[in-house]
A protein has these predicted regions:
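Short beta-strand/loop segment that forms part of the nucleotide-sugar
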Residues: 39-47, 66-68
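Non-catalytic, C-terminal membrane-associated alpha-helical segments of glycosyltransferases
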Residues: 229-240, 244-327
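Short, acidic, metal-binding catalytic loop of nucleotide-sugar glycosyltransferases
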Residues: 29-38
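Short beta-strand-to-loop acidic/aromatic patch adjacent to the donor-nucleotide binding site
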Residues: 90-101
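Acidic/His-rich active-site region of diverse nucleotide-sugar glycosyltransferases
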Residues: 76-80, 100-182, 187
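Acidic donor-binding loop at a coil-to-helix junction in glycosyltransferase catalytic cores
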Residues: 166, 190-196, 231
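Glycine-rich, basic loop-to-helix element that forms the pyrophosphate-binding segment
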Residues: 67-88
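Catalytic donor-sugar/metal-binding loop of nucleotide-sugar-dependent glycosyltransferases
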Residues: 186-189, 195-217
């Protein structure tokens, strides 16, 4: 049974779009059927060069669209939506990948899980393969192996205390947690932002959990074809940043992981991707790691820091939501 709307916490759902109206529209269509009334949907457009924005505004007028102005990457784009949600009084922010679809009870189950324990700082879903709807892609998230320098999703139900991170494909964050540790790490462009945030939460005393009744269908990596050297660069730059901050054995974590990933690509004869692994792992980053700031300074980080560009809100019905969304 759904919560009574007058007692439902307010949830802002944040999606990113970048030249992908087809996927975004399928995701938004699934959100119309959520059994949760007190919700607001925000789409942050990360500098699309196609007609995505115009089509989203035309076909989904109940969605608030924010223009980032350029492709800022996943964490920066999400942070724009998260800041807007916090300004609008959100009790929770649900980060949802635009290539995912939600079961009608997905959000209700996540909020129920969150409300059951005030120390939960991140709540995930049971995520299934879009191409094989009965196949589990991740039980909320997964675990990190510091000795091997990698992370792996759990492919079966597992107790919450064994889950190291919640995958960003479906990630519910309470307002109190954001006020405690801040937003996503803007020194990351893509990949590893979800383990980083969960480790930061745990360092600050928060727990993470999985709402098994919250079902999400998400495209697997196989649906996108072969990865590119550019993706390898992003992945390994982000992995190195994570391990240098959170691993008890950072040099081992970084270089064992790099060696294994480079070796795999060399055995495949993919020398461009092998070079990209090295380039990413040795890339310098001038943005301080949030974990480092938290470990050195007990003051809470701001949740309203300026994004890299001034976002533009594109919503003609800024205060008029869908029938399911209320201010």
């Amino acid at each position: 049974m759904a919560m009574e709307s007058e007692v439902q916490p307010k949830v802002h759902i944040v999606l990113l779009n970048w030249n992908s109206f087809g996927e975004t529209s399928v995701c938004l269509t699934s959100l119309k059927d959520l059994r949760y009334d007190n919700r607001v949907v925000i789409v942050v457009d990360n500098g699309s060069t196609d007609d995505s924005v115009a089509r989203i505004k035309a076909e989904f007028p109940w969605v608030e669209v924010i223009l980032a102005g350029k492709n800022l990457g996943f964490p920066c784009g999400c942070n724009i939506g998260m800041r807007r949600a916090l300004e609008d009084g959100a009790d929770y922010v649900w980060l949802l990948n635009n290539d995912a679809t939600a079961d009608p009870g997905a959000l209700e189950a996540m909020v129920a899980k969150a409300e059951s324990d005030p120390r939960l700082g991140a709540i995930g879903s049971a995520i299934y393969e879009m191409e094989e709807p009965s196949k589990l892609q991740a039980w909320g998230g997964g675990y990190v192996n510091f000795w091997m320098g990698h992370a792996r999703h759990y492919l079966a139900p597992i107790p919450d205390q064994k889950v190291d991170y919640i995958t960003g494909a479906s990630f519910l964050i309470p307002r109190a947690a954001m006020e405690s540790v801040g937003l996503l790490d803007e020194g990351i462009f893509l990949y590893w932002d979800d383990p980083e945030y969960c480790w930061r939460l745990k360092r600050a005393g928060w727990k993470i959990g999985v709402a098994g009744d919250s079902k999400i269908w998400h495209k697997g990596m196989t649906a996108y074809g072969k990865k590119s050297p550019r993706m390898d660069t992003f992945f390994n730059a982000s992995a190195a940043r994570f391990f240098r901050e959170y691993s008890p054995i950072p040099m081992i974590s970084v270089w064992v992981g790099v060696t294994l990933r480079m070796g795999k690509r060399l055995l495949m004869g993919d020398f461009d991707r092998a070079r990209a692994v090295w380039a990413g792992a040795t890339q310098k980053n001038s943005v301080p790691a949030p974990g480092r700031v938290m470990s050195m300074n007990s003051n809470r980080p701001t949740i309203k820091s300026d994004p890299q560009v001034e976002p533009k809100i594109e919503s003609e019905n800024h205060f008029e939501r869908s029938a399911g969304g209320r201010r």
